[in-house]
Amino acid sequence: MFVGREKEIERINRFISKRGALIVYGLRRVGKTTLIKKALGDKKIKFVYFECQKANEKTNVDLFVDLLKESISFTDASFPSFLALFKELNQRYKDYVFVIDEYSYMKEYYLESKKSKSKLEAQRIDSEFQNIIDDYLTNNNLILSGSSIYIMEKLMDHESPLYGRFVGSIVLKQFTYLEAKMMLPSLTDNDLIAFYSVFGGSPYVLERINQQKNLKDNICELLLNEDGKLRNHLKNNVINELESDPDLHEILNVIKNGCKKYNEIENQSHITTSGLLDKRLKKLLDLDIIEAKYLIGREDDKRKKYYEIKDNLLKFYYAYVFRQDNKMNFLGEERFYELFIEPSIKTYISHRFESIVKSYFSESIKRGYNRDIVEVGTFFFDNNEYDCVAKKIDGTYVFFEVKYYSKPMKRDEMEKEMEQLKNVKGLKVSQIGFVCNAGFEEKLPNVIYLDLADFFFKS
């Protein structure tokens, strides 16, 4: 089922009308291959799609030639390099798009090798593709795609041979909650919030959700079951990649469903050397598994920086599933859920709901609403966390208290929160707002209120 990605398809269509190279990248299973094939297929463009293996250049060239023989009756000749191959392709074919997916796999083969000249080989391949783009795309187009955010972004760095060679770049991200709704149309708005909080926005993940079953049954079947499709998906595509360095697991296990500052990670993990912790955090940032955030209005204060796992599904995995195999095998998925997930699942969802609220503001601004808001973030004051704080054009701030409830928010709770805000220092508070998925018992004057009808733009 293909939904969304209209802007990305439009950009690929514009690229096709030119000559040159496009770079497309994003995490595994985010839909890069599906997007590229959909865009090219809809326009009936002639294309050849090749996925690199984690092997040397010659092996990948030979595999690509084998594919070309099958798909476009290519020559039986052997080629020593991609440069020689594309020289031939440019002479013999016209108006093709050649897609080289997982370019980063081939780069990783050299970068991870212990041989002394391997890094030079990786740079040489980039130089080859520089020559291909400069000299051998006069008749065709090239798309380079990859899952390693770090490697693919490095291709566009000013020190890379490929700097300035791409006519465009597309960073493919997970679906927002609104796009996820298009893939899960049978869910109620409230259920969608809960499902998105647990499973996130990967199209691959969303396709495996059974919309006829409740959240508990989907978690048990997909994540707690020993053969669960999403449990295996995480192990194969994320967890196994981290196995060579247990410190990475340690950091993620500390962060889990929350936001952790550097000193909190340092104190709660077993990584006592600050230099080592810095390296491990950089590794997770490069892998695009975590992100570093700053408090709104405190962007220059590096001490206030905190770290968070980006993907909801991975958050859930580390919060509940990681290192729990023995318990799950002994208890079975149903009983494990009842004992270790059910008591805190609403709290877990409430934390993720805060992120969805921030996503709502971004979407609303793009739709022409809330035009006076320029930034949304989090703020800590006097041991209190303010979930969602919006900075306005005039430099003042609107503080939103976010609640994920099964019943409407009560007046006395709102009044208590408003009283507490009087003590906030450091930011100029112009207004307060309340966000509750279940609505409100009553509404007070001069206060902003948001509920699910607003989130799905139904009001």
Question: Language-model features: where?
Answer:
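Phosphate-binding site recognition
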Residues: M1-E334
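A cross-kingdom feature that marks ATP-driven nucleic-acid transaction machinery
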Residues: K305-S459
